[in-house]
Amino acid sequence: MIGPKPTLEDIVLDLQPFPQPQPVDLMCYEQLSDSSEDEDEVDHHHNNQQQHHQHARPEVPEDGDCYRIVSDCYSCGKPLRLVVVSSHEELRVLEDLLMGTLDIVCPSCASRV
């Protein structure tokens, strides 16, 4: 703009239509190495993890269900949430223990014990 007032000659309008979007190739042309040694290492690591999990987790009983238990920390009183897989009868035993003399502490209180 030249001068104190705008004129039509000062305003440049680009009235051409916007260009249409162009297709983009999203394919990845990366070549993976065919190393059976890498696969053996992955399989060996996977098998070790499966064996560890098999020892860490007992078999879930066929009549077992998942239950959420909310209790308070014995030391600080913060609410604790437990999830157990158990049969209905075993859950009743756990309930009796929690209502009786069995107390649970939170991880922060457990580290101070």
Swiss-Prot record:
The keyword Secreted does not apply. A zinc finger (unnamed) spans 73-109. InterPro entries: Papilloma_E7. It is found in: Host cytoplasm; Host nucleus. Signal peptide: none annotated. Keywords: Activator, DNA-binding, Early protein, G1/S host cell cycle checkpoint dysregulation by virus, Host cytoplasm, Host nucleus, Host-virus interaction, Inhibition of host innate immune response by virus, Inhibition of host interferon signaling pathway by virus, Interferon antiviral system evasion, Metal-binding, Modulation of host cell cycle by virus, Oncogene, Transcription, Transcription regulation, Viral immunoevasion, Zinc, Zinc-finger. A motif (Nuclear export signal) lies at residues 91-99. The E7 terminal domain is an intrinsically disordered domain, whose flexibility and conformational transitions confer target adaptability to the oncoprotein. It allows adaptation to a variety of protein targets and exposes the PEST degradation sequence that regulates its turnover in the cell. This is Protein E7. The gene is E7.
